[in-house]
């Protein structure tokens, strides 16, 4: 039997970038094409926080489960939602990509 280490939470978590029940808007475009076209620019409600690797993601780096009426639910990275100014979302996305590829991001070099 394979055990899934994911942690799915449906209540507020101190330190998470959003609150359950918060209204959020999905960014209007996806440069890398990872967001389903039908969700782009849509507004929905946060219904869950998903931590694929709780040891490294909890509490501030979850996937955010969003329910969009008439479309259903999908998971989004924080930078794929309009929670912060675009410049901040871009910095977060660059950092996340650098971490995935094993490099150091400019955020890690800051004092």
Swiss-Prot record:
Pfam families: SH3_18. One of its GO terms (biological process) is carotenoid biosynthetic process. Induction: By light. The keyword Nucleotide-binding does not apply. Keywords: Activator, Carotenoid biosynthesis, Transcription, Transcription regulation. Monomer. Interacts with CarA and CarH. Involved in carotenoid biosynthesis. Antagonizes the transcriptional repressor proteins CarA and CarH by preventing their binding to DNA. Can also dissociate preformed CarA-DNA complexes. Does not bind DNA. This is Antirepressor protein CarS. It comes from Myxococcus xanthus.
């Amino acid at each position: 039997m394979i055990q899934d280490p994911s942690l799915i939470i449906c209540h507020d978590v101190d330190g998470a970038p959003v609150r359950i029940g918060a209204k959020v808007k999905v960014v209007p475009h996806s440069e890398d094409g990872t967001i389903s076209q039908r969700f782009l620019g849509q507004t929905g409600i946060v219904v869950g926080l998903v931590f694929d690797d709780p040891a490294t993601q909890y509490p501030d780096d979850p996937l955010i489960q969003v329910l969009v009426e008439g479309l259903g639910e999908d998971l989004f990275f924080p930078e794929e939602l309009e929670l912060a100014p675009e410049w901040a979302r871009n910095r977060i996305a660059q950092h996340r990509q650098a971490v995935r590829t094993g490099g150091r991001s400019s955020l890690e070099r800051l004092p």
